[in-house]
């Protein structure tokens, strides 16, 4: 059928990361099947992917807002009938995986040179994009929580709770960035959320072992700060040893 051919073309385009073609074919599918979750998500996903290389932050915000809206209606169009469970599970897991790949992608940022008492320093507007990313992650969490409530067999929601856990872990990783100072910087809040999800997963699966929260690589500023602190400590130790030797 036309829809099946369009889906095949869209998936091939996505596999090749041809986001313009991906957007085009998923748009065709959505026109014929307005409740098709795959088409709803990936049509806006392709747009958002292209926005990452656009230096205009406001255009990026517009495209990411469309993706956020698409995520928010995943649960509205979710078919909770038992016969669709495995198909839906595979699709939701794929969407989550691709969303996490998007959230961890590089993106164009604008830099500015500013001047202070200690000379010049460079800043960038990456925090605004990270705000957008966190909002996507929160939108995914909300949509998944709504889907969980539609599944009678709670043991079949285990994979959905794991998705929620992954999204909270992503938000926590943003908070740990030294450069991030914006709206979602309360690390304790996200750690508490992760712990609550871990407890839920242990109830559903006694063999569940929570994944370690990966430490982010240290930034250049963090490394420089550690080196500077180490030098100061070494100098203090040397001075103490010197004064002790002089007093003997």
Question: Where is each model-derived feature located?
Answer:
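Residue-level recognition of tetratricopeptide repeat
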Residues: 2, 35-36, 154-158
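Short coil/turn linking the two alpha-helices of tandem helical-hairpin repeats
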Residues: 11, 44-55, 100-127, 172-179
């Amino acid at each position: 059928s036309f829809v099946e051919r369009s889906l095949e073309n869209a998936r091939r385009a996505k596999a090749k990361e041809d986001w313009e073609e991906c957007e085009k074919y998923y748009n065709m599918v959505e026109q014929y099947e307005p409740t098709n979750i795959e088409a709803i998500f990936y049509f806006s996903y392709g747009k958002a992917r292209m926005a990452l290389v656009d230096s205009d932050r406001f255009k990026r915000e517009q495209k990411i807002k469309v993706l956020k809206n698409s995520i928010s209606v995943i649960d509205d169009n979710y078919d909770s009938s038992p016969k669709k469970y495995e198909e839906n599970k595979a699709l939701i897991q794929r969407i989550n995986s691709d969303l996490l790949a998007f959230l961890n992608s590089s993106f164009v940022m604008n830099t500015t040179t500013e001047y202070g008492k200690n000379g010049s320093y460079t800043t960038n507007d990456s925090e605004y994009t990270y705000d957008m990313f966190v909002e996507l992650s929160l939108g995914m969490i909300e949509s998944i929580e709504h889907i969980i409530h539609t599944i009678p067999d709670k043991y079949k929601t285990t994979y959905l709770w794991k998705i929620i856990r992954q999204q909270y872990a992503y938000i926590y990783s943003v908070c740990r960035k030294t450069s991030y100072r914006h709206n979602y910087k309360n690390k304790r809040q996200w750690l508490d959320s992760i712990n609550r999800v871990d407890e839920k997963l242990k109830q559903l699966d006694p063999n569940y072992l929570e994944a370690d929260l990966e430490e982010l690589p240290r930034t250049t500023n963090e490394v420089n700060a550690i080196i500077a602190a180490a030098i100061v400590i070494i100098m203090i130790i040397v001075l103490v040893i010197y004064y002790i030797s002089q007093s003997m």
